[in-house]
Amino acid sequence: KEIEEGARAIGAGYMVIGDAAMARRALNAVREAFDAALTFDDPQVHADVTKPQKIVAVTGVTGTMGQETLKQLLPRGNRFKIRAFARPSEVNREKMKKIAAPNLEVVWGDLGNYEDIKKLVDGADYVLHIGAMVSPAADKYPEKTLYTNIGSTLSIIKAIKEQPDPDKVHFVYVGTVAETGTRTYPIHWGRVGDPINPSIFDYYALSKVFSELAVYESGLKHWVSIRQTGQYPSNE
């Protein structure tokens, strides 16, 4: 889908391109999440609703951004069923045990395995692709970074296209401002229209450039790419 002129927006610390209406909804959802104070004891969470829960599939749930995403989505148990994708390591299993919830399903798998990705995507209404190999691991293992980050994105696109009704699936891809290169002083700001220019030897950024291009050229009806900047865990 061609990028509409009105689709360019900056908000909540993200650069957004793609489906304009979806971008606005994504930013509004972020703002609403921070304003809300729902818990599992809140009657709103368990309220009976006539509409079925939407299934939100999320990768990267054990990382900083993924953990914060779960914190915002899980309290909305009356609206969303969360399907979280995680690598089955001991550390990840312990981490996911701590956030067990009635509306949380964990899909254990590998981002490099298409069958695992398909289990995550099947039946989902929304797919949030946060998971990726990042620096410093990306600097140490460049080939694995390219394989994992690009391959997982292509697998998600393929899995969405294989759904009975691909047009009902909304894909949120998380990229990075590193796609447009360094932001060292004195030019330490960025804009959506900046040219793609990843820094030399930055394989993480390069993998994100190719992945975003794959999303852009995918032909999916509903997609958006959020070029995230940086973030800190809420407990630090």
Q: Where on the chain are the PLM-derived regions?
A:
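Active-site Tyr-X1-5-Lys
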Residues: 185, 199-224
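N-terminal Rossmann NAD(P)H-binding glycine-rich loop of SDR-like oxidoreductase domains
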Residues: 53-78
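A conserved FAD-binding loop/helix module that cradles the flavin
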Residues: 17-48
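Glycine-rich beta-alpha-beta "Rossmann" dinucleotide-binding loop(s) and their flanking helix/strand
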Residues: 1-20
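Flexible, glycine-rich beta-alpha linker
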Residues: 179-181, 202-203, 223-236
